[in-house]
Amino acid sequence: MPASQIVVPNETRSNRSNAYFPLDYLPQAIGMKIAMLVNLSPYAQWQAARISNSILYAIMGCFAIALLPRWKTLMALLLVIPPVAFVASSLMIDGMIVALSACMVAAIAAIAGNKHVISLPCTVALGVLAWALACEKLSYAFVAGAALFLPSAVMTVRRKVEFVGVAAVLMGVLYLPWSVLFSSSLAQVNVSHNMSVALSHPILTIGKIVRSMIFLGTYHLTQLPVWYTVMSVVLVLVWLAALVYTVKTTGAVRMAPSAWVGKYRFLILALVIAAAEIAAFVLFVGMTWNDLESMSRFGVFQGIQGRYVLPVLPVFLLGLVIVDDRKVSQRALAC
């Protein structure tokens, strides 16, 4: 691109570089800065950025696996499947979102298995983790809300308020000023007009979201390579087997509906959160890349990429967290 076309972002002008919070690219920036200090070529600098991004992803992935009480192998499997490994070794932020989501799920599972109330430092760390997820992409931070459903025996109301407070303060002090002054997002259509169309026809908009989600799920069977379809089927079967084993070993028979919901609250939450996160990024793509007014009633949103689903995968492991209310300490059999 000619230098005359490069836009330096400030209070009045923005470009593609500030579509994301600056700290989102800190892993890549570390590698690039080191490469610049040792006078490597521009190409080598980009490769160094990829390497540093991969290293930090691996560190956070190992932390999530170590923190998870059980089913560590399943978490490791999710973190190394080819699509995730690809984005983790690229310059994109998707790999870090996967790692942060995995750490959040592992932290919730570990807290649920505690025999005492979570400490204040751990609460602060959990709030920072939720803030980091929200800074990456707000839709992927929905999983952090699952912490509010932890039993009071391990996370009291006060701790939950502190958790929300830490995340809110960080958002207000660090993220919101940047968002107001510098944040921007590219769009091929008039987003304001799309919003008015969506609000005027909510049922049709919801229908487009649902159809786009179904299309995204069935796309593997028709367009992607066979190995990708096989991998997806294997992952689903492994998760279902782990879920059946967990339910069977925790005795779910002959329970009142209220007791069942309390015991398997995180299974319900995992399915709801996963659907909400997918619907959120589908809606975002629909609002920014599609003209809702000119779309047919049964059309699907264009521009949805499969990599958007990858950060949702760790959320399903949240469904393996089981709350045992038979003891005062309320433990969890997490994956």
In which residue ranges do the predicted regions lie?
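Interfacial juxtamembrane loops and adjacent helix segments
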Residues: 1-47, 294-295
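Membrane-lumen/periplasm interface segments of multi-pass, membrane-embedded glycan/lipid transferases
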Residues: 164, 168, 175-256
